[in-house]
A protein has these predicted regions:
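Helix-coil boundary and N-terminal low-complexity module in membrane systems
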Residues: 1-109, 120-216
Length: 216
């Protein structure tokens, strides 16, 4: 029993991460309820999970709402852009499915739409984690998300698989898994992305902290 409660044991560490994932998922769900705030809440979620991947987390709630507040405007702008593009692609897909016929024109149009949807998915995967980590313009974040997603394609596929498997489990296997949902997905993706984020820009948080210290 003493060994089971040892905080150095891998089992305890895993259970702790799962508990944190569930808590962060609740925060994310609550803060995403207005819909328009999904971008800010997702950015805040990744800010915390990336810190956790580095073992630099210090107060989940405080960190979450700090990131939510500081990134609200750029995250909301990015989210509204992505929501508009996603809605446009979904509407096109619906119309295409209803009007589709077996000829070269519709086949090519379907291929173009699928390609656009794949590119959209790549950008969507990386946009908010990048915003949680780096300061950039709206276009700069979207451009970097695309370039990183294409360059590190294996990581992109793994991240897409994580979300896909979680969605499948929730819908078809074990509905209560939604309690972990986005929190667990973000945590797993953060571990995958951490090395990539270092490669493309080092550790910007450490730079900001040093800069703030110098100003003081």
């Amino acid at each position: 029993m003493r060994d089971l409660c040892n905080t150095d044991k891998p089992l305890f560490a895993v259970l702790t991460k799962l508990t944190y994932s569930a808590y962060l998922n609740i925060l994310w769900l609550v803060c995403s309820l207005p819909i328009v705030t999904i971008g800010a809440s997702t950015t805040a979620l990744f800010y915390v999970t990336l810190k956790m991947a580095e073992d630099r987390d210090d107060g989940l709630t405080r960190m979450f709402f700090k990131a939510f507040r500081e990134n609200f405007k750029p995250a909301t702008k990015l989210w509204l852009i992505l929501l508009a593009v996603g809605s446009f692609l979904a509407a096109d897909g619906f119309v295409l499915r209803r009007m589709w016929s077996e000829n070269i024109f519709w086949t090519l149009l379907t291929a173009v739409l699928i390609g656009a949807a794949v590119l959209y998915g790549i950008v969507l995967l990386y946009t908010f984690p990048l915003l949680a980590r780096f300061e950039n313009t709206t276009f700069g974040i979207l451009k970097t998300a695309f370039l990183v997603g294409v360059r590190y394609l294996f990581c992109t596929l793994l991240m897409a698989a994580i979300y896909g498997i979680m969605g499948y489990v929730i819908v078809f296997v074990f509905t209560p898994a939604f309690l972990l949902g986005m929190g667990l997905c973000a945590m797993l993706c953060s571990f995958l992305m951490l090395r990539i984020l270092y490669l493309i820009g080092g550790d910007p948080d450490a730079v900001h902290e040093e800069h703030d210290h110098d100003k003081n």
